[in-house]
Amino acid sequence: MVTVKSVFCGEELILETGLLAKQAHGSVTLRLGNTTILATVVAAKEPNLESDFFPLTVNYNEKYYAGGKIPGGFFKREAKPRDKEILISRIIDRPLRPLFPEGFRNEVQIIPTVLSVDTDMPTDALALIASSAALTISWIPFGGPVAAVRIGYKNGEYIINPKNSELSTSELDIIVAGSKDAILMIEGEAKEVSEEVFIGAIELAHKEMQKYIDMQNEMASLCGTQKIEQELFEFDADLVKMVTEYGRDKIESANYNPDKTKRNESMDNAFNEIEEYIKTKVEDEKLISQVKGICHSIEEEIVREAIVEKCMRPDGRALDEIRPITTMTNLIPRVHGSALFTRGQTQCLSIVTLGSEKDAQLMDDIYGKENKTFMLHYNFPPFSVGEVGRYGAPGRREIGHGNLAERSFNAVLPPKDKFPYTIRVVAEILESNGSSSMATICASTMSLLSAGVPLNASVAGIAMGLATYKDGYKILTDIQGVEDHLGDMDFKVAGTRKGITAFQLDIKLTGISAQILKEALEQAKKARYFILDKIDATIANAGEISDFAPKYKTMDVNPEKIRVLIGPGGKNIKAIIEETGSDVEIQDSGVVNIFAPDTPTLDKTIKLINSYVKDPEVGEVYDGIVKDIKDFGAFVEILPGVEGLCHISELAYKHVMNVEEVLKIGDEVKVKILDVKGGKYSLSRKALLEKPADYVEEEYNKKEKKHGKKRF
């Protein structure tokens, strides 16, 4: 067994191999305090040279036993991956993928498994380190090692590898992955931090991760790792020359078109024409199958060369130019809030629904349970790109894009005591030509304001790109689909006028420098301000809450009355909920939150709650029920368990000889409180009637009223 050690978050970090999962091609167990992660990697022995992509799969998984828990549900076992597991799988995949050799077509599967967990320690960076170590000691060709470090920021100081308890108050939560020389991946959110703070965190993280890269190299040296040369896919050199000579000009002429559909049609026609020509020169079907791949490589070179050397983008924009933007709000009836954001040929329809506390999503994992009251779901149907495709449950990409957009708003959402609604945002991508996740953020800002959500600030997002060619590079603002596909970087930045709120960096190179990121951030800031101007011109402040949204009221109740409101076994509060259909949340502090489907129901719910918790006061009017009748008056229940006396002289303006001339037991009667003494209530029906013009109170009524008997 081989073991290497370092320090992580002030604790001993151990990487070991040779004990667990020895049949895997690479197996590393990471230990940090009570956290244990087993990362395994296996690769197919033979390449699939007919594949046009590298088949890498990462399946990060958390076992419930790691946190000493039994899964919920009927089957009591782990099932499909939870969103969190998918998101961490993506965090691991993204920095590792660029470091495999170009043309490597062996299928690779990485499975990091959390075996035990310290619930105050995030596992994503650790799982990435373990996965990289497993690759590094395996026979699989890999240009690593890679390491990851999380950085927090509080009170003007950075926190290296903060724990979960520290992240709750941190202004920054950024995870940075990199190699010895460059940055490979960035992911996280912030509370409107500046670009300077952001870059400082990246530079600190890259410096800190070097020791985790060194320990992986040490482990590989101790294991005596030898990489096995694999057959890499390469295009036939003579065929490349033939396709280039005949087809480069055709591909270049098809490249420049501001319309995505027309450009794709022109490019497809060029590819097909080139393939038909090659068929007249070549009979080998395997060679012919390479033609379109070669055409695609030529297209990539043309796009990069034009951008870097001529500052020409495929759609004719300047390098820092944003596509035309149009915005609309409140275009969908009946929903609680809606907005449409269109940027070029990317279009997002965002819909907001407001709900009560019971609509919150219960998050249950190895770290415990919590209620999630803000959700943003991103949908990317195949028609958005003019294709027929799978339609159903969200895939990994949709979950990742939705999570990024959701995190963009965490810094600007109103506190629960001011806006206690559960908020669900659904982003429907209706057209896509790149940067759809950033369009989601822009559309969702407007739909949230449209729904009456008082955001602390508007949020906008922009996707920055990078094109490299020979020794040069150019940074692109607002990349479209072809620039994302053929370029080297997709750097998504979201934020307000004050600062950055969320970010995500993916690259196809073996790393980029902090200087390139600085330049990209500066351009992104200008673009963000431009888009925020467009949003503010459409809707700058929160509107009125929709008539179709639940109505909300907070009541402050004497904590001593809470038991009365709840009742034995919850009898009273259940009766209120059943009668009104409202959602009522009661806190021990006496705060009662009420959500009702409409205003009349809300008023009724408040009235019923007051019937248990409010002390009646002089002058108030109640709808009561006659409980008992005596010669001198009627006892009327005005609140549950609270009765008052309506004296016979207070039944009517006319002389009443017998109480039952006016009231009978069980009658409903509206009464007004005349007096409260020692917890006894004097009531009047007469006070709510119209007084006759010739009425004169009789003396015997005064005397009888004064000396009448009372029952309490």
From Swiss-Prot:
Where primarily located? Answer: cytoplasm
Per the UniProt entry, the Enzyme Commission number(s) are: 2.7.7.8
Belongs to which family? Answer: Belongs to the polyribonucleotide nucleotidyltransferase family.
Quick check: keyword Transmembrane in the entry?
Answer: no
How is this protein named in the record? Polyribonucleotide nucleotidyltransferase
GO molecular-function term, one example from the UniProt record: RNA binding
Task: Name the keywords, alphabetized.
Answer: Cytoplasm, Magnesium, Metal-binding, Nucleotidyltransferase, RNA-binding, Transferase
Q: Where is the KH domain?
A: 550-609
Q: Which residues of the sequence carry a binding annotation for Mg(2+)?
A: 484, 490
Cofactor or coenzyme needed: Mg(2+)
Give the function comment from the record.
Answer: Involved in mRNA degradation. Catalyzes the phosphorolysis of single-stranded polyribonucleotides processively in the 3'- to 5'-direction.
